[in-house]
């Protein structure tokens, strides 16, 4: 991979020079090309390079997908992911790797290697929402290119609101988390707020350089078009309830999911920590 061939600081520095949004617009177009020779070759090359196993997918061959984006956001066969069944369990929202997990120290979340970022900046400056999660808990799950890219509910809850925060599109990996300050609070992100039996919860889908769009099951594609201002939606009173493990959104190309809980509600399981590979539905802890 390119990142492996470059020192981490150099790789991160190059990110500042790239036309991030232009590249994402190009990817949005390219991954929707339906010419069989093009999309089949692209899917095969991607599977070889990233060692993608299609055995778990509903569609198991490149020819079965209408375009590369359909492959990237592929559905899994029923039963290949089991969702934890303990009454108070927190289910992992996605396949990937735990980047960080722990407590929100006042208003600060740990990013990597001594770097932290502010909760208020992550939430787009929404003071009332910020207060609900101060001294709470968080988990950050990184989705690699080979992973299943649909996002699911960690605990049962009712959708309260959604916020889209425009921003940069740095790639998300070890190099950038260690070297780009406030990475998750400066990248484009979609924040979904839920009311749960264990208090407020936020599920945040963080964009990256080749994340051509983010969508939810209740709204559809949120980006593009990309806005230069923060957009907010109020869903209170609409009764949009989702059970634990239900699909709520997806990355069209992938990145990172951050889940926030209010103070005193989440307790992480022993043995769950940064660097651990996880599958959607795995119990990460409990929420009361």
UniProtKB/Swiss-Prot annotation:
Positions carrying Pyruvic acid (Ser): 255
Task: List the lineage, top down.
Answer: Bacteria, Pseudomonadati, Pseudomonadota, Gammaproteobacteria, Methylococcales
Summarizing the function annotation, the protein's role is:
Catalyzes the formation of phosphatidylethanolamine (PtdEtn) from phosphatidylserine (PtdSer).
User: How is this protein situated with respect to the membrane?
Assistant: Peripheral membrane protein
Q: What is its EC number?
A: 4.1.1.65
**Designated name of the protein:** Phosphatidylserine decarboxylase proenzyme
One Gene Ontology term from the biological process aspect of the record: phosphatidylethanolamine biosynthetic process
Q: Where in the cell is it found?
A: Cell membrane
Keywords per UniProt: Cell membrane, Decarboxylase, Lipid biosynthesis, Lipid metabolism, Lyase, Membrane, Phospholipid biosynthesis, Phospholipid metabolism, Pyruvate, Zymogen
Domain of life, per UniProt, equals: Bacteria
Please give the pathway this protein is involved in. Phospholipid metabolism; phosphatidylethanolamine biosynthesis; phosphatidylethanolamine from CDP-diacylglycerol: step 2/2
Q: State the similarity comment.
A: Belongs to the phosphatidylserine decarboxylase family. PSD-B subfamily. Prokaryotic type I sub-subfamily.
Q: What are the catalytic residues? A: 95, 152, 255
Q: Name one GO molecular function term.
A: phosphatidylserine decarboxylase activity
Gene Ontology cellular component? Answer: plasma membrane
What is this enzyme's catalytic activity, as reactions? a 1,2-diacyl-sn-glycero-3-phospho-L-serine + H(+) = a 1,2-diacyl-sn-glycero-3-phosphoethanolamine + CO2
Cofactor annotation comment: Binds 1 pyruvoyl group covalently per subunit.
Q: What cofactor does this chain's UniProt record say it requires?
A: pyruvate
Q: What is its main location?
A: membrane
Assembly and oligomerization: Heterodimer of a large membrane-associated beta subunit and a small pyruvoyl-containing alpha subunit.
- Positions bearing the site annotation: Cleavage (non-hydrolytic): 254-255
Q: How is it modified after translation?
A: Is synthesized initially as an inactive proenzyme. Formation of the active enzyme involves a self-maturation process in which the active site pyruvoyl group is generated from an internal serine residue via an autocatalytic post-translational modification. Two non-identical subunits are generated from the proenzyme in this reaction, and the pyruvate is formed at the N-terminus of the alpha chain, which is derived from the carboxyl end of the proenzyme.
> InterPro entries, alphabetically?
PS_Dcarbxylase, PSD-B, PSD_type1_pro
- Source organism per entry reads Methylococcus capsulatus (strain ATCC 33009 / NCIMB 11132 / Bath)
